[in-house]
Amino acid sequence: FIYRVLINLILIISPVIIFFRLFKKKEHPSRFKEKFGFFTKRKIDGKLIWFHGASVGEILSIIPIIEKLENNKEIKQILITSNTLSSSKILSDFKFKKTIHQFFPIDTNYHTKKFLDYWKPSIAIFVDSEIWPNMISNIKENSISLILMNARITDKSFKKWKLFNSTAKTFFQKFDI
């Protein structure tokens, strides 16, 4: 509940945040709208595999997997989401045929539902420790398989999660693998 209130407060001030990020060239002038549920890429009918990683390191770590999946005839499209402009630019260096990039939506209930309704992924794979409560809850409400890949937790993070033990347990049980 507290998280949802906070994320909606951030949404209210997001135009100011986006303006400063555009000024600092940390947002793409035409693509920042993807974070608000305006899609710039077309979904192809068929099986879509979705990977999400925060930034460059996470995206680079999945390139070998994407290269293999590109050759799988059952998979029609591979969607990669991230939060940073630099990770988007890295992906453009590769000449993938089935793989596209979109920015991850703001983690409100509305934006995450809109994202899932449009893309309809067969499976969602979150790389490292990218944890977005509204998105993860909506993924499970849509009966989409959810994988946390290459996850790790530091001692510091573990102590923080332990403060909210029942919430953490409920949350992490949403992952299939």
Question: What are the roles of these predicted feature ranges?
Answer:
Residues 15-177:
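Active-site and donor-binding regions of nucleotide-sugar-utilizing enzymes
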